[in-house]
Structure formats: C-alpha cells, structure tokens
Amino acid sequence: MKIINIKIIRNNINNFSLPQHITPGSAGLDLLACIEKPVSILPKETRLIPTGIAIYIEDIEVAGIILPRSGLGHYYGIVLGNTIGLIDSDYQGEIMISLWNRGSNKFILYPGKRIAQLLFISILRVKLSLVKSFDPFMKTIRGVKGFGHSM
C-alpha cells in the first residue's frame, strides 16, 4: 500500500474527517465540502468548493483523479465543472472542487457533504519519438478513423 501525505488546511466544519473509503470495496476516497454554512448552487451555475485538505503525492508515477459522485449527478444534476480533475504529483495546494449545477433546480450544499471522489492512479511516463510516417507493417484495422468510427 502506498502512503500519500495529507495536510489539513482548514477545519471549519463540525465532524470534519479525512477522506476515506466508505466501504471496503470503494475505489475512491470521498471528499467533503469544507464550508462553514450552506452554499446555494443555482441552475447552470458553477461554484468552487474547498475540501480543507492538501495532499503531496511526491511519486511522479502516481496522480490523483477527482471524479464526480454518481448520486449527486443522477438525482440532483450536480457534476464536476471540469468533468474530471487531475492532481499532479508535485501539487501541494488545497484540493478545490468545481461543482456545476446542470439541473433546473437550486441545490443547497451543506457543510461536510460528500462532493467528489479521489482516486489514485499509476502514470506511465513516456518519451515521444518524432517520425515522418508510421511503419506500413504496423497498420491497424482502424487506421485514422476517429469519432463514431464503429457506428
């Protein structure tokens, strides 16, 4: 198991807790809204919400991914404003979550509410090699067919 350093930036809510796996099978660690009072998110509005924590991954072959919580999106229309968040190994600032209300009703976010998931992934570091063309013996069935190629 890899150890990731975490620091509490602000602890301004009752029952503040560090990110945790809610069940033994949970892939992501739940991130909480570290806010002092409820925040309204109007339809089509985005709000930047603090989590109260910072992490230092340190290992350049690991990154953090911020993912939405499925229930918030499905039931309330609350999704991540940037669709996915990437935390580089050398970032040490507070983790902030951009929430977007894509729904048609006002959403009230309460202090301590679980708002996103943090997942750690391995990163394959590559070196790009510039070529003028690809080897003709390495042609694939797909080739250059892009979006919708298999429809």
Curated annotation (Swiss-Prot):
Keywords: Hydrolase, Magnesium, Metal-binding, Nucleotide metabolism. Its cofactor is Mg(2+). Pathway: Pyrimidine metabolism; dUMP biosynthesis; dUMP from dCTP (dUTP route): step 2/2. It comes from the Bacteria. GO terms for biological process: dUMP biosynthetic process; dUTP catabolic process. It catalyses: dUTP + H2O = dUMP + diphosphate + H(+). Pfam families: dUTPase. The keyword Lipid metabolism does not apply. This enzyme is involved in nucleotide metabolism: it produces dUMP, the immediate precursor of thymidine nucleotides and it decreases the intracellular concentration of dUTP so that uracil cannot be incorporated into DNA. PANTHER family: DEOXYURIDINE 5'-TRIPHOSPHATE NUCLEOTIDOHYDROLASE. Belongs to the dUTPase family. This is Deoxyuridine 5'-triphosphate nucleotidohydrolase. It comes from Blochmanniella floridana. The gene is dut.
